[in-house]
From Swiss-Prot:
Residues 1-36, 37-92 form a transit peptide. It is found in: Plastid, Chloroplast thylakoid lumen. GO terms for cellular component: chloroplast; chloroplast stroma; chloroplast thylakoid; chloroplast thylakoid lumen; chloroplast thylakoid membrane; cytosol; thylakoid; thylakoid lumen. CDD domains: cyclophilin_TLP40_like. Ubiquitous. Lower levels of expression in roots. The N-terminal helical domain blocks the interaction with the potential target PSII subunit chlorophyll protein 47 (CP47). It comes from Arabidopsis thaliana (Mouse-ear cress). Its EC number is 5.2.1.8. SUPFAM superfamilies: Cyclophilin-like, Oxygen-evolving enhancer protein 3. The gene is CYP38. This is Peptidyl-prolyl cis-trans isomerase CYP38, chloroplastic. Induction: Up-regulated by light. Down-regulated by dark. One of its GO terms (molecular function) is peptidyl-prolyl cis-trans isomerase activity. GO terms for biological process: lateral root morphogenesis; photosystem II assembly; photosystem II stabilization. Pfam families: CYP38_PsbQ-like (PF21329), Pro_isomerase (PF00160).
Length: 437
């Protein structure tokens, strides 16, 4: 493991001299997906306080934030060090509009489809989240309006939605529509019975049906990867993995399983590389190597190498920087959006959500990503709605969709017991692990 250390720079925070608290509103036992966090047999629901102070960490992410407004700054302690890979520079990239922060919503909007009818069903169902911000049972009246609007829109646009299904997925798509209709009726019964606590779980369920409908509109893989990367492991679609982490020195929680959805539609090379490494069990038994309140990071193997050594070449396998921009049909490779002069471009899968997953790389080598990955721990106050410091500079390729809040509990030295692909492995093309096996 690399041993050179470098100082981290000063960073800035908007509207706060401390990081705000982030509430966790669910138990970490998640039976429908068998995704859980546990402390023996005790179900654990917690409230996370302010982030921990920065500490020595495994690889360098220089979090210098150039924001668009005047803000107070917080200097890092003098002994905060990191090895020289990778670094996040201090140039911000503009995005427009208020950010969507829910990881599953981001994944739905990132699908390569163009069907206005299903998007108009999706929106009022997502708006239930805002309705639940109303105090008490009064929120239920707003929830009812959301659901009735979605139901009407579904009936009005059903023929357009059905016509949008890929031929091979029509049966499954129609099944998802039936489940969505039944789910919305269940939600109206919940509202009628004034069971506020049952709304959010049912919303999550019916939005999964919406996501299923939208995925059934994708007909194959929508573009060709550039020839120079075509023989690399490629994720041509999506895959889900479960990452089980053994948490040390925490009396409240012993282990946690994080569900991660990997988006190969928008980052096929990056996501394919990761799935291939997962199937090689590369990360099994590896420690968390950085956890400082901004990122959780791992992937630096033991020894002098800073990435995955391909046994067929005995060299580090690297992947290019891969950024999909809204309105483009294929990703940009090898250059940051800043280098391309696309300062106001919006990326399809942004660093908006707590638990955004991205590929780490060296500061001045865009195509140096290999096996080191990080998850962003970020409250919305860290960046104003029209400024994002990481989009277009690092390749996002997935989001933690279950138990993401518990990423903040991970510490250096906690152990990844295993990462397993639970769906979508059939979307991996050119898997090198099979050749190695």
């Amino acid at each position: 493991m690399a041993a050179a250390f470098a100082s981290l720079p000063t960073f800035s925070v908007v509207n706060s001299s401390r990081f705000p608290r982030r509430r966790i509103g669910f138990s970490c036992s998640k039976k429908p997906l068998e995704v859980r966090c546990s402390s023996g047999n005790t179900r654990y629901t917690k409230q996370r306080g302010a982030f921990t102070s920065l500490k020595e960490c495994a690889i360098s992410l220089a979090l210098s934030v150039g924001l668009m407004v005047s803000v107070p700054s917080i200097a890092l302690p003098p002994n905060a060090h990191a090895v020289a890979n990778p670094v996040i520079p201090d140039v911000s990239v503009l995005i427009s509009g208020p950010p969507i922060k829910d990881p599953e919503a981001l994944l739905r909007y990132a699908l390569p489809i163009d069907n206005k009818a299903i998007r108009e069903v999706q929106k009022p169902l997502e708006d239930i989240t805002d309705s639940l911000k109303i105090a008490g049972v009064k929120a239920l009246d707003s929830v009812e309006r959301n659901v009735r609007q979605a139901s009407r829109t579904l009936q009005q646009g059903k023929s357009i939605i059905v016509a949008g299904f890929a031929e091979s997925k029509k049966d499954h798509g129609n099944e998802m529509i039936e489940k969505l209709e039944a789910g919305m009726q269940d939600m109206l019964k919940i509202v009628e019975d004034r069971k506020r606590d049952a709304v959010a779980p049912k919303q999550k369920e019916i939005l999964k049906y919406v996501g299923g409908i939208e995925e059934d509109m994708v007909d194959g893989f929508p573009y060709e990867v550039p020839e120079e990367y075509r023989n690399m492991p490629l994720l041509k679609g999506r895959a889900s993995v479960d990452m089980k982490v053994k948490i040390k020195d925490n009396p409240n929680i012993e282990d946690c399983v994080f569900r991660i959805v990997l988006d190969g539609y928008n980052a096929p090379v990056t996501a394919g590389n990761f799935v291939d490494l997962v199937e090689r069990h590369f990360y099994d038994g590896m420690e968390i190597q950085r956890s400082d309140g901004f990122v959780v990071q791992t992937g630096d193997p033991e020894g002098p190498a800073e990435g995955f050594i391909d046994p067929s070449t005995e060299k580090t396998r690297t992947v290019p920087l891969e950024i999909m921009v809204t309105g483009e049909k294929t990703p940009f490779y090898g250059s940051t959006l800043e280098e391309l002069g696309l300062y106001k471009a919006q990326v399809v899968i942004p660093f908006n959500a707590f638990g955004t997953m991205a590929m780490a790389r060296e500061e001045f080598e865009n195509d140096s990503g290999s096996s080191q990955v990080f998850w962003l721990l970020k409250e919305s106050e860290l960046t104003p709605s029209n400024s994002n410091i990481l989009d277009g500079r690092y390749a996002v390729f997935g989001y933690v969709t279950d138990n993401e809040d518990f990423l903040a509990d991970l510490k250096v030295g906690d152990v990844i017991e295993s990462i397993q692909v639970v769906s979508g492995l059939e979307n991996l093309a050119n898997p090198s692990y099979k050749i190695a096996g």
